[in-house]
Amino acid sequence: MLHSLPIRRALISVSDKGGLVPFARFLADHDIEILSTGGSAKALADAGIPVTEVADFTGFPEMLDGRVKTLHPKIHGGILGIRDNPEHQRAMAAHEILPIDLVVVNLYPFEATVAKGAAFEDCVENIDIGGPALIRAAAKNHEAVTVVVDPEDYQPVMDAMTAEGGATTLELRRKLASAAFARCGAYDGAISRWFQGQVGDETPRHIVFAGRLRQTLRYGENPHQKAAFYGHGIARPGVASAEQLQGKELSYNNINDTDAAFDLVCEFAEPAVAIIKHANPCGVAQGASVVEAYKAALACDPVSAFGGIVALNRPIDRDSAVEITKIFTEVVIAPDADAEARAIFAAKKNLRLLLTGVVADTTAPGLTVRSVAGGMLVQDRDAADLLSADLKVVSKRTPTERELADMLIAFKVCKHVKSNAIVYVKDGATVGIGAGQMSRVDSARIASWKADEAAEAAGLAQSPTQGSVVASDAFFPFADGLLAAAKAGATAVIQPGGSMRDDEVIKAADEAGLAMVFTGLRHFRH
């Protein structure tokens, strides 16, 4: 086994030329012959670095508009030949194949081409063929060949060569080979997913997901669990794309909760705020301004909001920053923040401030993935957008315009509450949220109890659920959950419908004087 091998000849063919010139100059200073192609060769020559064109090295020109550059025995034989195998060495000598010890390749920007909405033909032309072949060949023969697919690895290679007298260690080569195969897998996965979308294959025989390491986390949900955060490059504004302006590194739970918060608040067209704990909303509201929305959202459950995540769908101004910093908040995420708001947050050193630049389109298609023992569940993300025209009035009484507006907000929030979910809303703000109960009637009771508790703490004469509307994420299987909401003071109900006992539930609503609408749309969240 070959451990520390000197590098004498390198092949460089890169699309991302960041850091290329300093790295190549380092190689040249170590008397390493550099072979290169096209734009890479030009960049090196322009920098005054000695370089040999691959076409001159092989004696075979680039052809087919550059589709064939490095697919040649003198290239692949030089990479794949086993250095201590006599037969390989005899064959290489017979065909005048020289060993290539370092392969530096990064691939055509296929993912970026797709992300910018390029035409089908442009996307196809950005599918790299020669690059993956070079990478896989070098990674396979990692006992003798060093492969680099990421500019971030230039420095570790230079450090190793400096320490090892122009060589790299087997340990480093294996690590780089692992990264190389991972990059090829991610690249092929991106291509296959794009093609599946182009041909409308909703349940492909094989599916590949890949991500790039964004952050090694201190631990996972709990301190005994290891964790990391990966970005997959899909252009959707949120925690993965946000700029963190201040505060400690995000934890696993911070990331999970912040994602839930921003996903929820982006549902709203009007200025809105969501406060989240353990991926469930403590309070959500829309208002004429974000500061009004924040105050209303906080009023829903100020006790649970302590140490929570605050998401806004508008830039943060001074007044909202003042209100948010009155209690301990882990993370604030918003499209932007003005200078005064940033200065106020800066005084709270532990508060993490994330800015996304824009809000997300919650109706855009996407996938959610969950692992199970021996497999994974893949589904479309819940991107359904409910409009008033979609509602079916099933009660004798028709909801008022105010009730209708609050119903749509309540059902919007319900979509983001763990099932079984019950949400009371009044005047554009949640006033009671019941989450995650095995019994729907218990969720209704808990939401009412939480509202009563908040009202008592605020010194209100009556519970804010009086005169509210109530939403359920799934149908009421019996009338008991609806009656619990009526007892809490709700005047109108929005629910999917579809129970075998819908008639019984409708009758109970009519007897209680409630207006009720069916959506025909369920929002389970587990």
Swiss-Prot record:
InterPro entries listed in its UniProt record: AICAR_Tfase_dup_dom_sf, Cytidine_deaminase-like, MGS-like_dom, MGS-like_dom_sf, PurH-like
Source domain of life is Bacteria
CDD domains in the record, alphabetically?
A: IMPCH (cd01421)
- MF terms (GO), sorted A to Z: IMP cyclohydrolase activity; phosphoribosylaminoimidazolecarboxamide formyltransferase activity
The UniProt record lists the MGS-like domain at: 1-149
What GO cellular component is one of the record's annotations?
cytosol
Q: What metabolic or biological pathway is this protein involved in?
A: Purine metabolism; IMP biosynthesis via de novo pathway; 5-formamido-1-(5-phospho-D-ribosyl)imidazole-4-carboxamide from 5-amino-1-(5-phospho-D-ribosyl)imidazole-4-carboxamide (10-formyl THF route): step 1/1; Purine metabolism; IMP biosynthesis via de novo pathway; IMP from 5-formamido-1-(5-phospho-D-ribosyl)imidazole-4-carboxamide: step 1/1
State its Enzyme Commission number(s).
Answer: 2.1.2.3, 3.5.4.10
**Is this entry keyworded Hydrolase?**
yes
Q: Do you know which HAMAP family this protein is assigned to?
A: PurH (MF_00139)
| Comment text on domains | The IMP cyclohydrolase activity resides in the N-terminal region.
Its recorded name reads: Bifunctional purine biosynthesis protein PurH
